[in-house]
């Protein structure tokens, strides 16, 4: 009818979708988590690529922690010196409030580092990989690249097998509830284990 509009959702045509993505697709834990939280936002962000990326302060702090801990463990450098290097080489201009939090969290980094060193001393897994990119490619009607970045993998080769531990650093509070797994939630560590095993 003239001047009418139907706001009901109509599915995307499958062949149009395959052509749009060029029959290939990237998946990660964060994109899957985004889908479970809001499929429409996932569609806008990961399919149509309409997201305008702005680094939030939380992401900045996460990058700071990863940078400092990796280099402190590998190169045995001072935590305070590494924090200064990160701040000076990062383009973000910190507000006074952000500087206050960075200084406060920097002191906590020393405690975290000491705790990690104690854990390493009591572990039999002596080999480490940092910020390891892992991916598994599944070919079919659509080629899917399943990828992830694992903060740290500790491993030891024994006989014909390899024992691994996957570590993911969190700067915020995260609930890990295995009861959520059947619903596709709290999947980060199982996904990383799958990627590490199959890549």
Regions inferred by a protein language model and the residue ranges of each:
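Active-site-adjacent bridging/hinge elements
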Residues: 36-47, 80-84, 154, 160-171
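A non-catalytic, helix-rich entry segment at domain boundaries
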Residues: 64-139
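Non-catalytic protein-protein interaction segments used by genome-maintenance enzymes to assemble
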Residues: 127-197
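Active-site-proximal structural scaffolding
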Residues: 10, 25-28, 36-37, 58-62, ...
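C-terminal, charged and often intrinsically disordered regions of DNA end-processing helicases
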Residues: 1-71
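Short intrinsically disordered, low-complexity coil segments enriched in acidic
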Residues: 1-6, 100-104, 191, 199
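Short, well-ordered loop/turn and helix-capping segments at boundaries between secondary-structure elements
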Residues: 48-49, 53, 70, 74, ...
């Amino acid at each position: 009818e003239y001047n009418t509009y139907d706001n009901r959702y109509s599915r995307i045509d499958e062949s149009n979708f395959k052509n749009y993505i060029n029959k290939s697709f990237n998946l990660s834990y964060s994109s899957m988590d985004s889908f479970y939280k809001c499929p429409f936002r996932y569609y806008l962000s990961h399919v149509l690529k309409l997201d305008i990326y702005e680094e939030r302060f939380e992401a900045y702090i996460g990058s700071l922690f990863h940078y400092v801990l990796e280099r402190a463990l590998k190169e045995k450098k001072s935590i305070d010196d590494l924090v200064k290097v990160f701040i000076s080489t990062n383009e973000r201009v910190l507000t006074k409030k952000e500087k206050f939090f960075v200084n406060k969290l920097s002191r906590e980094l020393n405690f975290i580092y000491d705790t990690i060193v104690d854990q390493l001393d009591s572990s039999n897994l002596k080999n480490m990989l940092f910020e390891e990119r892992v991916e598994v490619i599944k070919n079919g009607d659509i080629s899917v690249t399943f990828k992830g970045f694992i903060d740290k993998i500790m491993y030891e080769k024994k006989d014909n097998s390899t024992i691994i531990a996957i570590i993911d650093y969190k700067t915020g509070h995260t609930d890990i509830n295995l009861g959520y797994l059947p619903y596709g939630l709290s999947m980060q560590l199982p996904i990383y284990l799958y990627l590490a095993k199959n890549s």
